[in-house]
From Swiss-Prot:
Cofactor(s) listed in the protein's UniProt record: Mn(2+)
Name of the protein in question: Probable Xaa-Pro aminopeptidase PEPP
Sequence similarity: Belongs to the peptidase M24B family.
InterPro entries in the cross-refs: Aminopep_P_N, Creatin/AminoP/Spt16_N, Creatinase/aminopeptidase-like, Pept_M24, X-Pro_dipept-like
Lineage: superkingdom: Eukaryota
Enzyme Commission code: 3.4.11.9
Catalytic activity: Release of any N-terminal amino acid, including proline, that is linked to proline, even from a dipeptide or tripeptide
Originating organism: Fusarium vanettenii (strain ATCC MYA-4622 / CBS 123669 / FGSC 9596 / NRRL 45880 / 77-13-4)
Binding site for Mn(2+) 2: D257, D268, E436
Length: 469
C-alpha cells in the first residue's frame, strides 16, 4: 500500500458505528431479535497510589472499538433498534482548565468521532434511568465494567454476552484497522532498522532501546504496544526479558522484540542479528533454520488454514534442521512423538494482533493435554481479515533444556556434545516479515505488514553499513 493510500484511509474517522452494527449482528446470532441498548464505559482516570499524579492512561479496548474515543471518563450508549450511538464526555471543570486547557466540547466530539450524538456525562444518569423499551428490551454491558452509581431504567440487564461478541468481532479487521496496524509497523520497522545501523556503535542494551523509542516518538508513535525487549547474548533466550541494561561487549547476537502502537493498534516485530556484523557459523546455522521455519509457515497461511497445522509445520522444520546439525539424533518421527522440540521452541507460533498485542478471539486452551498446542494463543481456522504474528524460534535456554537432558524420554534424542557448541547463540526468533512479522490473512495468502529486512545477508550488510542495503 502506498503512503498516500494509507494517509487517505487514516484521514477519515475511526469506524465505530460500523463496528457497532457488526456487534449487533453477531449478538443476534446468540439472541435472535435482540432489542435494547449496548452500554460501555471507557477507562476512568485514577491516581497512582500515595501520589497526586494520575496513572498512565490506557483506554478500554472494547469501548474504543465502538467509539474511537481515547479520552478518560467517557461512556457509550448505543440504541440497538435505531442504531443511534451517543457518546458522553466529561464536562468542563473551570478549575481544571487552568492546568489542562479546555476539554473537548460536544460539537468537537461530534466532528471527531463516528457517533450520532455527543453529550456531557452530567446528563448520563438521568438518561439511563429513563431508558424505555418493550418487555424484551435489555441493556447489554460488560461484567465489572459498570460504575456502582449507574442505574438503568430497564429491568433486563445482561453482562454475560457482550464481551465475547466483541471479542469475535475484533478478530476480523476492516480497512481502517489494517491501515492502523500497517502504520504502526511502518514506524516500528524504522526503529528496528535504526537499531541495526547503530548496533556497532553502542555499548549497552539501553542505548539501543533508546534508539528505538526515539525513532518511534519522532514519527508520532509515543506509546509502545509492550515493553521493548533488547537482549544481547544468552539473554535472548529469555522470552520476556525486559532489563535492557546489560553491556554488549563479548556477546554474539542481539534480539530485539519491540513494537509501537498507532492510535491504540499494535505492532509486534522481532529481529535477531550479529552484533559484529557477521554471524558465527553456529548462529548462522540456527538463523537459517528459523528463517526457513518462518518463510515456509507464511507460505501456507491463507483464510481457512488451521493455525495448529501451521504451528506444527514450524516444529517439523525445526526438528529437521536440528537433526542436520546433529543436535537432535534419532528418527524425526520419534522426536516429534516425544515432543522434544519443545526444549528449543517452547512457545506458540504466533497470535492475533490488533487493539491488543495478544489480541482477543483466539480461544486458547492452556490446559490442553497436547503440550505442542498448550501455549498457542490462537486456535482453529484463520478467517480472511485477521492479522496474526508469525514468530517461530529456536532458543538455547539452559533452564529449559537441561531437564530434557536428564529425562528418559528425551535424553537419547539430544546430542549434548554437539549442543555445547550452541549455548552462546542465545535465541533466534522470527515472526512475520523480518524475524517476527505481522501478516494480514487474505483468501489466497497473506499481506505482510512488516517491512524491515530479515534476510541474513541483508542484516549483515546493514550492520556493516554496506551501500544499497
Amino acid at each position: 500500500m502506498f503512503a498516500e493510500d494509507l494517509d487517505r484511509i487514516l484521514s477519515g474517522k475511526y469506524p465505530g458505528k460500523s463496528h457497532a452494527l457488526r456487534v449487533v449482528e453477531l449478538l443476534r446470532e446468540k439472541v435472535p431479535n435482540a432489542k435494547g441498548y449496548l452500554y460501555l464505559e471507557g477507562r476512568m482516570s485514577k491516581l497512582l497510589e500515595d501520589s497526586d499524579e494520575f496513572e498512565p492512561f490506557r483506554q478500554r479496548r472494547h469501548f474504543y472499538y465502538l467509539t474511537g474515543c481515547d479520552l478518560s471518563n467517557c461512556y457509550l450508549l448505543y440504541d440497538i433498534d435505531s442504531s443511534k450511538s451517543t457518546l458522553f464526555i466529561p464536562p468542563i471543570d473551570p478549575e481544571e482548565v487552568v492546568w489542562s486547557g479546555l476539554p473537548l466540547s460536544p460539537q468537537q466530539g461530534l466532528e471527531k468521532y463516528d457517533v450520532d450524538e455527543v453529550k456531557f456525562s452530567t446528563e448520563l444518569d438521568n438518561i439511563l434511568s429513563h431508558l424505555s423499551g418493550s418487555q424484551e428490551s435489555t441493556v447489554y454491558t460488560i461484567a465489572d465494567q459498570v460504575c456502582p452509581h449507574i442505574k438503568f431504567g430497564l429491568d433486563n440487564v445482561d453482562s454475560s454476552i457482550l464481551k465475547g461478541v466483541i471479542d469475535r468481532c475484533r478478530v476480523v479487521k476492516d480497512k481502517y484497522e489494517v491501515a492502523m496496524i500497517r502504520k504502526a509497523n511502518n514506524i516500528s520497522s524504522l526503529g528496528h532498522e535504526a537499531i541495526t545501523k547503530q548496533a556497532s556503535k553502542a555499548s549497552n542494551e539501553m542505548q539501543l532501546e533508546a534508539t528505538f523509542l526515539g525513532h518511534c516518538v519522532a514519527h508520532g508513535a509515543k506509546k509502545m504496544a509492550y515493553p521493548p525487549i533488547v537482549a544481547a547474548g544468552r539473554s535472548g533466550a529469555i522470552l520476556h526479558y525486559e532489563a535492557n541494561d546489560q553491556p554488549l561487549g563479548g556477546k554474539q547476537n542481539l534480539l530485539v522484540d519491540a513494537g509501537a502502537e498507532w492510535n491504540n493498534y499494535a505492532s509486534d516485530i522481532t529481529r535477531t542479528f550479529p552484533l559484529s556484523g557477521t554471524f558465527t557459523k553456529e548462529s548462522r546455522q540456527i538463523y537459517d533454520i528459523v528463517y526457513k521455519m518462518q518463510m515456509e509457515c507464511i507460505a501456507i497461511i491463507k483464510a481457512g488454514v488451521r493455525w495448529e497445522d501451521v504451528h506444527m509445520l514450524a516444529h517439523e522444520i525445526a526438528v529437521e534442521g536440528l537433526l542436520q546439525l546433529g543436535i537432535f539424533q534419532g528418527a524425526k518421527a520419534d522426536i516429534l512423538k516425544a515432543q522434544t522440540s519443545l526444549a528449543f521452541f517452547p512457545h506458540g507460533l504466533g497470535h492475533y494482533l490488533g487493539l491488543d498485542t495478544h489480541d482477543v478471539g483466539g480461544n486458547p486452551n492452556f490446559d490442553d493435554e497436547n503440550k505442542y498446542l498448550r501455549y498457542l494463543r490462537t486456535r482453529g481456522t484463520l478467517p480472511a481479515g485477521s492479522v496474526v504474528t508469525v514468530e517461530p524460534g529456536i532458543y538455547f535456554c539452559e533452564h529449559i533444556i537441561r531437564p530434557y537432558l536428564q529425562d528418559e524420554r528425551h535424553k537419547d534424542l539430544i546430542n549434548s556434545d554437539v549442543l555445547d557448541k550452541y549455548w552462546d547463540v542465545g535465541g533466534i526468533r522470527l515472526t512475520q516479515g523480518s524475524i517476527e512479522d505481522n501478516v494480514l490473512v487474505t483468501p489466497t495468502g497473506v499481506d505482510n505488514l512488516t517491512t524491515t529486512i530479515k534476510h541474513p545477508d541483508q542484516l549483515e550488510g546493514m550492520i556493516r553499513g554496506l551501500e544499497g542495503v
